[in-house]
């Protein structure tokens, strides 16, 4: 890929990270509209061209104005840049067709598993991405795309032959935007995107969010994937989830392995629930920019961890750098504490979540195999499960959650991944319920969330139980997706 030369034109391709989310007309100048598209980093260079020549020519041919986020300014949770296209409906469709063509030219090296390096975001690409279009639309436009009872999106899929999925809509919170994923063959995707552009034309508020940088966006941002959490990087993390995430970084604070993870609560006697929330938020921020936080728990002492995090901060964008610096500060505090260098204390007494952690580690629910598979992805997940259990014990001691309160959580799981949660004869699902104390129900086969091929999973129980169950299911789904992405022959 050619390096991007400085742009001398009056209207730059890359604009400052301004955040624009306001009520305004859906058109620009004389019938012009706006379309926001996600572009994988591997395709950005071919879209821009040497010295910006390709994109300049594209603007001349279509009459559109095209802006891209800066080269390292990715949409949260991805390594994809944000492209904002302004023009007539015909121009929007023409520009997107060009972008889609470049996205389909996925380099072969991008589909191969790579060695995880905490210093750089991961760049391994799901091969399915080449057949997808990802559009970011305001919440109001998303409603028009879905239609009453999902009728509109169903019609779009039937007429185009493409799959159209929207990122999940959270309960009680209105995200400014949602991400639409269109999958299929080139002509199918083109037809579906054209139908979406038509909805953009119909929505008076379709131009309410024109920012191309999300580095300074406050509050939750929509997940770029249609499955899993509605959020790309949660801004508000419940205490149980906060501690679970913080525990996953136990390698910053002590010995490697499950013993070190089990010792995590005792290693932070002076850190409050607020500290844990800050640590969790920082970890989520790094994860949202593609950094593998699991690799921080590989036996680094506090001094070594601080060095690794300093290296991350030196090469990251401002948001990720701030998160790395914060974690380095906590690692330094832990290393300077009275327990630094001491032998790890025994694991906490197994409570509800403690039992879940120990059983998960023993039975390898998240390991899903031995040998290479476990080495590639199983061990960190087992450690993370144990970390969640350790965090649960810590929260019980701190009384950060009212365990008696009942809570209902709904998450979406892709149809083709439900089997991973059910297990043979439903055994895995039963075990999840026994380990967490939560009740887990999955919608019947063929009953999907509107506009998706996702089954509804309802989790009921105490806050700690629902958080543990949600964490376990999400990690299982994430792990299974990773295995399938690296091994396309694996089915079920």
From Swiss-Prot:
GO terms for biological process: central nervous system neuron development; mRNA processing; negative regulation of cold-induced thermogenesis; neuron differentiation; regulation of alternative mRNA splicing, via spliceosome; regulation of axon guidance; regulation of RNA metabolic process; RNA splicing. It is found in: Nucleus. Gene3D superfamilies: K Homology domain, type 1. Pfam families: KH_1 (PF00013). There is a cross-link at residue 112 (Glycyl lysine isopeptide (Lys-Gly) (interchain with G-Cter in SUMO2)). Residues 32-99, 130-196, 406-473 form the KH domain. The keyword Transmembrane does not apply. SUPFAM superfamilies: Eukaryotic type KH-domain (KH-domain type I). InterPro entries: KH-I_NOVA_rpt1, KH-I_NOVA_rpt2, KH-I_NOVA_rpt3, KH_dom, KH_dom_type_1, KH_dom_type_1_sf. One of its GO terms (cellular component) is nucleus. Disruption phenotype: Knockouts are born indistinguishable from littermates but failed to thrive, demonstrating progressive motor dysfunction and overt motor weakness, and they die an average of 14-18 days after birth. They have agenesis of the corpus callosum, and axonal outgrowth defects specific to ventral motoneuron axons and efferent innervation of the cochlea. Conditional knockouts in excitatory neurons die between three and four weeks old and show disorganized cortical and hippocampal CA1 and CA3 laminar structure. Functions to regulate alternative splicing in neurons by binding pre-mRNA in a sequence-specific manner to activate exon inclusion or exclusion. It binds specifically to the sequences 5'-YCAY-3' and regulates splicing in only a subset of regulated exons. Binding to an exonic 5'-YCAY-3' cluster changes the protein complexes assembled on pre-mRNA, blocking U1 snRNP binding and exon inclusion, whereas binding to an intronic 5'-YCAY-3' cluster enhances spliceosome assembly and exon inclusion. With NOVA1, they perform unique biological functions in different brain areas and cell types. PANTHER family: KH DOMAIN CONTAINING RNA BINDING PROTEIN (PTHR10288). The third KH domain (KH3) recognizes specifically 5'-YCAY-3'. Interacts with PTBP2; the interaction is direct. This is RNA-binding protein Nova-2.
């Amino acid at each position: 890929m050619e390096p991007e030369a400085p742009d001398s034109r009056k209207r730059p391709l890359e604009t400052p990270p301004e955040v624009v989310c306001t009520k305004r007309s859906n058109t620009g100048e004389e019938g012009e509209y706006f379309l926001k598209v996600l572009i994988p980093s591997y395709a950005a260079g071919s879209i821009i061209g040497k010295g910006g020549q390709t994109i300049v020519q594209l603007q001349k041919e279509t009459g559109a104005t095209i802006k891209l986020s800066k080269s390292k300014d990715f949409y949260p949770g991805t390594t994809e840049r944000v492209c904002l296209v302004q023009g007539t409906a015909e121009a929007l469709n023409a520009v997107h067709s060009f972008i889609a063509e470049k996205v389909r030219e996925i380099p072969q090296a991008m589909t191969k598993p790579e060695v995880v390096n905490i210093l750089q975001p991961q760049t391994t690409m799901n091969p399915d991405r080449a057949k997808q279009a990802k559009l970011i639309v305001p919440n109001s436009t998303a409603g028009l795309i879905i239609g009453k009872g999902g009728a509109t999106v169903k019609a779009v899929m039937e007429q185009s032959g493409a799959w159209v999925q929207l990122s999940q809509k959270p309960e009680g919170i209105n995200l400014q935007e949602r991400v639409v994923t269109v999958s299929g063959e080139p002509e199918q995707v083109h037809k579906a995107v054209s139908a979406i552009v038509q909805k953009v034309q119909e929505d008076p508020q379709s131009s309410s969010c024109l920012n191309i940088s999300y580095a300074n966006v406050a509050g939750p941002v929509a997940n770029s994937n249609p499955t899993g959490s509605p959020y790309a990087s949660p801004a508000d993390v419940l205490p149980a989830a906060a501690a679970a995430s913080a525990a996953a970084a136990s390698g910053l604070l002590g010995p490697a392995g499950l013993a070190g993870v089990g010792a995590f609560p005792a290693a932070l006697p002076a850190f409050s629930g607020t500290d844990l929330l800050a640590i969790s938020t920082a970890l989520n921020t790094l994860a949202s920019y593609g950094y593998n936080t699991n690799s921080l728990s590989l036996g680094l002492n506090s001094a070594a961890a601080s060095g690794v995090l300093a290296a991350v901060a030196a090469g990251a964008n401002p948001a990720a750098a701030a998160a790395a610096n914060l974690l380095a500060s906590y690692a330094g505090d832990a290393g300077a504490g009275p327990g630094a260098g001491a032998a790890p204390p025994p694991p906490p007494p197994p409570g509800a979540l403690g039992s879940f952690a120990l059983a998960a580690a023993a039975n390898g629910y998240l390991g899903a195999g031995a040998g290479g598979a476990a080495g590639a992805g199983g061990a960190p997940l087992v450690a993370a499960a144990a970390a969640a259990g350790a965090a649960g014990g810590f929260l019980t001691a701190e009384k950060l959650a009212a365990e008696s309160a009942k809570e209902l959580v709904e998450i979406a799981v892709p149809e083709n991944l439900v089997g991973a949660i059910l297990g043979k004869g439903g055994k895995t699902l039963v075990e999840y319920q026994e380990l967490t104390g939560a009740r887990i129900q999955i919608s019947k086969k063929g009953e999907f969330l509107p506009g998706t091929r996702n089954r509804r999973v309802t989790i009921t129980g105490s806050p700690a139980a629902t958080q543990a169950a949600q964490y376990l299911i999400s990690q299982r789904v994430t792990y299974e997706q990773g295995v399938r992405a690296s091994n396309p022959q694996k089915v079920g």
